[in-house]
Amino acid sequence: SCASRCKGHCRARRCGYYVSVLYRGRCYCKCLRC
């Protein structure tokens, strides 16, 4: 899912927090506290 892919991506970058939004079939991911 979008959230799980985003979570994995931000975890790999060692970020402490993430926000994921599924909009019109596209996954948008923002990593925070990196």
UniProtKB/Swiss-Prot annotation:
InterPro entries membership: Myticin_preproprotein
GO CC entries: extracellular region
Disulfide bond residue pairs: C2-C27, C6-C29, C10-C31, C15-C34
Signal sequence residues: none
Compartment(s) where it occurs, according to its Swiss-Prot or TrEMBL record: Secreted
Claim: RNA-binding is one of the keywords in the record: no
Keywords, in A-Z order: Antibiotic, Antimicrobial, Antiviral defense, Antiviral protein, Disulfide bond, Immunity, Innate immunity, Secreted
Pfam families: Myticin-prepro (PF10690)
An example Gene Ontology biological process: defense response to virus
Chief place where the protein resides: secreted
Function: Has antibacterial and antiviral activity.
Protein's name in the database: Mytilin-B
Organism: Mytilus edulis (Blue mussel)
